[in-house]
Amino acid sequence: MTDSDVQPPKIEFPCERYPIKVIGTAGEGFSDLVIEVIQRHAPDLDASTLVMRDSRNGNFLSVQVLITATSVEQLQAIHVDLRATGRVHMVL
């Protein structure tokens, strides 16, 4: 089997407890911004699943939440809207 034969795992929708990790410039309101954007597309987001971690030097903050993913289009829309904030560097 070659690398080109390896397919990424398929996600079955709806997918409960789908993790989204957002990394951005640390600053006031970053986690609130992330939650606000994700809730537009996943209104059932449980904010109690939020996990935040500062980078070693405190320049960046990672925010992870769990959502019920309903479609590829939903995940793409979340990614696009998070990147459009200008404060997000990476969405995993």
Curated annotation (Swiss-Prot):
Gene3D superfamilies: 3.30.70.260. One of its GO terms (cellular component) is cytosol. InterPro entries: UPF0250_YbeD-like, YbeD-like_sf. Disulfide bonds: none annotated. NCBIfam families: PRK00341.1. Belongs to the UPF0250 family. This is UPF0250 protein Pmen_3793. It comes from Ectopseudomonas mendocina (strain ymp).
